[in-house]
Amino acid sequence: MGAVRPMMTTLNNIVTDLAALDEAATIYAAEPWTGDSKALVAQEPLAGGLPPETKAAGLKYFIEVAIARDFLNGWIAGLDHAPSPQEMCDRLIRYAVTDA
């Protein structure tokens, strides 16, 4: 099981560390979503909804860690170069907004 990041960070930092995160966790981020958005990784409550720490910080559901990993791994496999962390974050944001 990977890590959960209950401390506030940025969406860029979370995407950079995605491989180390608990795949059962969820990413929450402040809108509008950018690489610099405040974000954290937490377990979704069993009853659903937002974890208390995300509500207090004004964060919204962004994407589940497992879905983010699967999407980025598939996207990267089709590229002819290694994307930068910023490119990965930008692409994941587009996916979360338009396809997830």
Per-region residue spans from a language model:
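Extended, charge-biased low-complexity segments
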Residues: G2-A47, T54
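Amphipathic protein-protein interaction modules
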Residues: A39-A100
